[in-house]
Amino acid sequence: MTVACKAGAATRYGRSGGRIQPLRGFWAAALMFAFVLGFHAMTTPLQAQTPPLKLVALGDSLTAGYNLPGSAAFPAVLEKLLREKGISVEIANAGVSGDTSQGGLERLDWSVPDGTDGVILELGANDALRGIDPAVAEKALDAIVTRLKARGIPVLLAGMYAPRNLGSDYATRFDGLYPRIAEKHGLILYPFFLDGIAGDRVLNQPDLLHPTAEGVRVIATRILPTVERFLATLRPRS
């Protein structure tokens, strides 16, 4: 009986018996689960390492953040708003107080390094305040855009309006230079950088020329949809 029992056991639990088949299914499922986990572990770090878009805000004191901490300047505030919307981006502050369009052109190469994905160009306010011939400002801004395009760097152009005390002829010539440049180069244009705050005593500092921190937030919020449209046109770096 002992022998019969062993033989029966061999028949019941042998290689063709009922307990080996479930184990095969178990190990197959376990191997598949391990493969999925391994694949996820391999791909997730690669996704996490996708570099953020690198922008440069090239401008004057309106970009630099005159009398404001760096965290309250336009580039930092805009970057924060974009990140809150899930857009991975870094915006370098290349604003220089008092800079004219010609000044921006002269420092262009070191202000906008290689590897930049796009530029927000905000210059011209000081040209108008000094009464510089709009043709001079237009020539400098056109040269900036031309050189950036030659380097494969897209540009979002932020426009400016001339003070009306300079006369209607000057204002017409100055205000029109931004649409002309945008049309010539096929740029996205934000018509007036100070839209929503110009002349507002609450949103500007006592000089009525430079925005307060709250004024900067208004600027960044208003330009945000245009910046998002600009970012959608950028090609990711390889």
Regions found by a protein language model. Name each.
Residues 50, 77, 84-87, 103-238:
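Alpha-helical cap/lid subdomain in secreted, periplasmic
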Residues 1-23:
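N-terminal secretory signal peptides that target proteins for export/translocation
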Residues 98-102:
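N-terminal helical cap/lid subdomain that shapes the substrate entry/recognition surface
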Residues 5, 14, 35, 85, ...:
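Domain-start "cap" segments at the beginnings of catalytic or binding domains
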Residues 47-97, 107-115:
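Serine-esterase "nucleophile elbow" of acetyl-processing enzymes
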